């Protein structure tokens, strides 16, 4: 832990402020400066669906909430603490009701975004929410957050690992969109199209190609803080916009059916959303390696079991085709949104031939597996850190007493060099 130091977030930031707070209904225009809201902020990436725009004049009038590449945007309400870095391809933007963090030279923006999106960061934010009716992450609290910060070089290594994961997932998404959304699949030049659908493709209910398994209902006393109990995949196991969120895993001691077990590579979908933003309901994730026993799915989750469809293609379709944006509109509820699982297999979908499904699977599956492997290694290191850090800070464990073996890439340069 050499070089680590205790800091407040404001001490390593150029500034920490809040996005515009006020009525926006009469400010939106068809084209102009991108205007980000909470629903556009997903873990580690922006979601451009339902992106709003404001005129340049209003953008200049609310200078405090201007964003630039490298800023970290953090959600205040709904899913507080969710964070992403403003990318280089968004040179000019503004926002409402977000915490804006502009890192100083000692803080890697991708590292601090990873901290906020981790189970540690979510717990830290969750313990500092304010408000009675709707809790939110206050900017004053954000400035005073205390963290133990590694040297910039170590931050960069950690951040680069997360960016490799994002890149692999983005590559798989781009291949899917190129082939099955833009219809530039291999052989498309010779294909005959009818009403936008290539000949040989079919429009069928999704249930023709997969079936749905509903999760297990449970009582609060069935959830236990005991790793020996069964891992339990709940609504908390989903990132905003889809994908698996490791920090949300629970443990369960109750009964379940064998079909409610999921294992590595299985596809699950959230059928509940705790907010009205609809950024979790209808979203899919792939189950990572959770051990030989697998995990049980809760009532907020369904399992989609492939029948006549390639499993990797099915996952890509559910994540990246726009199906989630379609199905989420069927969810209803005053405070908590619920989506009836039986509606999902009833939806008509465009299904390409199996040969084309298999072909994209051969390309995308290794990318997804590598991303999952990197994420799992990162989770294991985080678990070790979370277990050791309190003892190191308290002095109960000395760093010089640890036999830590570093890989060659992390070895410090020799004095001779």
Spell out what each predicted region is.
Residues 6-26, 39-69, 89, 94, ...:
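Sequence-specific dsDNA recognition surfaces
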Residues 99-103, 144-149, 156, 195, ...:
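Short, well-ordered beta-strand elements within core beta-sheets of diverse protein domains
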Residues 37-38, 56-117, 234, 259-319, ...:
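A short beta-sheet element
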Residues 2, 91-99, 107-110, 122, ...:
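A short glycine-rich beta-alpha junction/loop motif
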Residues 322:
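A glycine- and small/hydrophobic-rich beta-loop-beta segment
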């Amino acid at each position: 832990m050499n070089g680590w130091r205790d800091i407040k977030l404001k001490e390593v930031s150029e500034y920490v402020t809040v996005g515009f707070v006020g009525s926006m209904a009469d400010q939106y225009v068809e084209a102009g400066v991108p205007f980000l809201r909470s629903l556009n902020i997903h873990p580690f990436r922006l979601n451009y669906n339902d992106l709003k725009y404001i005129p340049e004049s209003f953008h200049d009038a609310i200078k405090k909430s201007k964003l630039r590449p490298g800023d970290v945007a953090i959600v205040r309400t709904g899913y507080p603490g969710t964070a992403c870095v403003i990318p280089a391809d968004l040179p000019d933007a503004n926002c409402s009701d977000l915490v804006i963090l502009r890192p100083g030279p000692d803080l890697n923006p991708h590292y601090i975004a990873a901290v906020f999106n981790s189970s540690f960061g979510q717990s830290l934010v969750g313990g500092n929410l304010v408000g009675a009716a709707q809790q939110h992450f206050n900017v004053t609290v954000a400035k005073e957050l205390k963290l133990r910060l590694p040297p910039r070089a170590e931050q960069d290594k950690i951040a680069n690992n997360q960016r490799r994961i994002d890149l692999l997932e983005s590559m798989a998404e781009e291949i899917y969109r190129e082939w099955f959304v833009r219809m530039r699949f291999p052989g498309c030049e010779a294909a005959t199209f009818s009403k936008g659908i290539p000949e040989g493709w079919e429009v069928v209910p999704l249930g023709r190609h997969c079936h749905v398994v509903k999760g297990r209902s449970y009582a609060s006393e069935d959830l236990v803080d005991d790793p020996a109990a069964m891992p339990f995949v709940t609504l908390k196991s989903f990132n905003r916009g889809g994908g698996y969120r490791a920090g949300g895993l629970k443990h369960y001691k109750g009964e379940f059916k064998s079909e409610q077990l999921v294992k590595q590579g299985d596809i699950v979908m959230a059928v509940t959303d705790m907010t009205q933003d609809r950024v979790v309901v209808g979203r899919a994730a792939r189950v990572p390696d959770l051990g030989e026993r697998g995990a049980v799915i809760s009532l907020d989750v369904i399992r989609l079991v492939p029948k006549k469809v390639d499993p990797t293609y099915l996952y890509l379709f559910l994540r990246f085709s726009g199906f989630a944006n379609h199905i989420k509109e069927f969810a209803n509820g005053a405070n908590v949104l619920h989506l009836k699982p039986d509606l999902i297999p009833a939806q008509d979908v465009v299904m390409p031939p199996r040969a084309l499904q298999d072909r994209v699977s051969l390309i995308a599956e290794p990318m997804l597996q590598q991303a999952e492997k990197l994420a799992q290694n990162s989770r294991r290191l985080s678990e070790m850190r979370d277990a050791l850090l309190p003892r190191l800070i308290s002095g109960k464990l000395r760093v010089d007493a640890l036999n830590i073996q570093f890989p060659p890439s992390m070895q410090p340069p020799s004095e001779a060099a």
